[in-house]
Amino acid sequence: MKKLTNVFWGSGFLVLLAVLFGAFLPEQFETFTNHIQKFLTSNFGWYYLIVVAIIIIFCLFLVLSPIGSIRLGKPGEEPGYSNKSWFAMLFSAGMGIGLVFWGAAEPLSHYAVQAPGGEVGTQAAMKDALRYSFFHWGISAWSIYAIVALALAYFKFRKNAPGLISATLYPILGKHAKGPIGQLIDIIAVFATVIGVATTLGLGAQQINGGLTYLFGVPNNFTVQFTIIVIVTILFMLSAMSGLDKGIQLLSNVNIYVAGVLLVLTLILGPTLFIMNNFTNSFGDYLQNIIQMSFQTAPDAPDARKWIDSWTIFYWAWWLSWSPFVGIFIARISRGRTIRQFLLGVIVLPALVSVFWFAVFGGSAIFVEQHGNSGLSSLATEQVLFGVFNEFPGGMMLSIVAMILIAVFFITSADSATFVLGMQTTGGSLNPPNSVKVTWGLLQAGIASVLLYAGGLTALQNASIIAAFPFSIVIILMIVSLFVSLTREQEKLGLYVRPKKSQRSQL
């Protein structure tokens, strides 16, 4: 068995501390973490916006630069997974259950509850609702994941470094990357991963329970949610023990097929013309305003500033907190692709799918609110999707497909997380032992269950977002480190705007 590292014990201690606070002092812990989170979003919102903008610009630079032809692996090495399986796995890990949870609920909230641009229920509010949903789940989120994944994949497969966050900083930290500073960085990454995934497990259990309640009258309580977590835990641990090539790959492919079926059925059975017209209009609006939205802080408009802090800054912090987990997993499955192929595959295609997903489900929710069930916006977040389906022909069938999708996404996210946590706490092993994966799987399930029971899930989510602040500094250092190493290799390989044939063969 691989030896457990100081990162395991250090991160385990922090997680235990957070869980104990959440379990025994849930209200105080929520107040404490909420205060810190609001302080960070209110005072450092500008910082989060600039960090994400830097990430996007750097990714664009790499795609357009000759550096983009460098391969993440040995010269001429082929990818280990087909394009379909690669996309399925990275997409399932990166968004997963969040798309189902927020696909209808977020645009509806922007339209009917709190519009980003002013008065709710207006045509302008509808356009803004979709535009901002595209913005929150589009290229910005995927660029954050991509840059962390790229740094890890490059240093692991090109430089043969350990698969650890700290190992990506060796060019600028030197020996300190292997010492206490490097271990602290890895501990923050593991803490953010454990807390973020445990929160998602809790939210997933709530959404499945909410769907069962809405559809079949099943009680909405902790007993049902705990039963859901137990069943899902057994399934994802069986998948985790079967290995990456069997369990996660198979489940991810199933995810994509089921998600595709649900998307197409909703588009056909729902208000198709309304969806496509508003998708086209709002997508153009998104492209036209993406730069302005990326830097908007609204310093002279208190209401708009509050909305930006609550949504955009919250999302940027959330994606940053999830980037260690998703980045490590994407890096693990991306060997053999060029930097350009990697970035286009991780950013552009997932962003387009996410955008269209919100157009279909968010557009459907807004249509129902306008023309059918005007009380849709008063439903709990986890029930909005099922409320939308209830207004469509074949609504029960759609709801059942959605429940299956939530469950499979649920299993895949937890499965991927146990794999990543196993890697991070065994020195970056690409194939961590089952015993370590099972340990992390049980811990995640236990954390989610305890905090669902105690009511401390929101506080745990706040803690994860707080961890995003120090990790954002790590990401900036990763960009600098990656740039330093790539420019050195560019000079070594003689890469220019038009490399010669002989030079391409060296990549």
Swiss-Prot record:
GO terms for molecular function: amino-acid betaine transmembrane transporter activity. It comes from the Bacteria. Disruption phenotype: Mutants show a strong decrease in the rate of glycine betaine uptake. Mutation does not significantly affect cryoprotection or virulence of the organism, probably due to the presence of other glycine betaine/carnitine transporters in the cell. The keyword Transmembrane applies. GO terms for cellular component: plasma membrane. It is a multi-pass membrane protein. Induction: Constitutively expressed. Up-regulated in response to salt stress and cold shock. It is found in: Cell membrane. The chain crosses the membrane at residues 7-27, 44-64, 85-105, 134-154, 184-204, 224-244, 256-276, 311-331, 342-362, 392-412, 440-460, 464-484. Keywords: Amino-acid transport, Cell membrane, Membrane, Stress response, Transmembrane, Transmembrane helix, Transport. PROSITE patterns: BCCT. GO terms for biological process: amino acid transport; glycine betaine transport; response to cold; response to osmotic stress. Activated rapidly in response to an osmotic upshift. High-affinity uptake of glycine betaine, driven by a sodium-motive force. Involved, with GbuABC and OpuC, in osmoprotection and cryoprotection of Listeria. Does not mediate either carnitine or choline uptake. Belongs to the BCCT transporter (TC 2.A.15) family. PANTHER family: HIGH-AFFINITY CHOLINE TRANSPORT PROTEIN, HIGH-AFFINITY CHOLINE TRANSPORT PROTEIN-RELATED. Activation of preexisting BetL protein in response to relatively low salt concentrations represents the most immediate response of the cell to increased salinity. GbuABC system is most important during prolonged exposure. This is Glycine betaine transporter BetL.
